[in-house]
């Protein structure tokens, strides 16, 4: 991550479906020089001006999450607005499996290594994608003024921690099944998907718990 994005986003609507309990909208968020961010916005019929926005970042992809009604039924009942997105390299933009040899222990080895070699680690690029989603929340008429809570699992965890440290528009973060300190990589170097969240030299300056401590919001 080298600097914060300075180009404005462009919001492109790509679909709309009316369901019994909610309205579903599809968007592509475009920012010059960056990958498009595909996302799905779900507005429950019970939503109101005080409804929080839950930004869901699922390593398995937003489509897989939405394929199980039980995953979001409670949110609909409680009137919570759901924003689901696939950050670059996952979900809609997952690299074909044949490009990654299993011996490297990383589901996105090609993308992760190329990103490091060009000086833009994939984790930092995903932080930019999260900032793009926050810009969307600030600009779209359905989302302006609503608090934003981020739920991130797996590979997305460290990117969510960095975004929460950098952007006060995030009210809180909940992380599951993810790394919360890079020291784990040193203590147990044989882990899956380490390259996805490596920032070379970062431990000379900070670790993920430092960002959690310095963020003036709940991150757990």
What residue spans do the PLM features occupy?
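Generic beta-strand/beta-sheet core signal
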Residues: 30-32, 40-44, 56-58, 85, ...
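Leucine-rich solenoid repeat scaffolds
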Residues: 215-220
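Generic alpha-helical hydrophobic packing signal
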Residues: 24, 41-44, 81-83, 160-166
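Cap/lid segment of the alpha/beta-hydrolase catalytic domain
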Residues: 48-140, 145, 180-193
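Non-catalytic accessory segments flanking enzyme active sites
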Residues: 1-43, 112
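Primarily recognizes the serine-hydrolase "nucleophile elbow" in alpha/beta-hydrolase
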Residues: 133-206, 210-214
């Amino acid at each position: 991550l080298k600097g914060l994005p300075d180009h404005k986003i462009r919001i492109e609507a790509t679909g709309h479906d009316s369901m019994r309990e909610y309205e579903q909208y599809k968007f592509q968020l475009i920012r010059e020089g960056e990958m498009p961010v595909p996302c799905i916005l779900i507005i429950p019929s019970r939503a109101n001006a005080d409804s929080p926005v839950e930004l869901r970042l699922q390593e398995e992809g937003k489509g897989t999450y939405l394929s199980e009604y039980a995953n979001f039924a409670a949110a609909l009942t409680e009137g919570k607005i759901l924003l689901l997105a696939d950050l670059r390299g996952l979900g809609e933009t997952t690299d074909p499996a044949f490009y990654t040899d299993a011996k490297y222990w990383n589901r996105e080895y090609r993308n992760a290594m190329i990103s490091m070699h060009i000086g833009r680690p994939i984790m930092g690029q995903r932080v930019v994608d999260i900032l793009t989603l926050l810009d969307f929340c600030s600009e779209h008429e359905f989302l302006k003024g609503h608090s934003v809570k981020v739920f991130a699992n797996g590979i997305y965890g460290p990117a969510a921690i960095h975004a929460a440290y950098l952007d006060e528009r995030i009210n809180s973060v909940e992380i599951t099944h993810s790394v919360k300190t890079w020291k784990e990589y040193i203590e147990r170097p044989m882990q899956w998907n380490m390259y996805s969240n490596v920032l070379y030299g970062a431990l000379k300056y900070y670790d993920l718990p430092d960002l959690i401590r310095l963020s003036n919001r709940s991150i757990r």
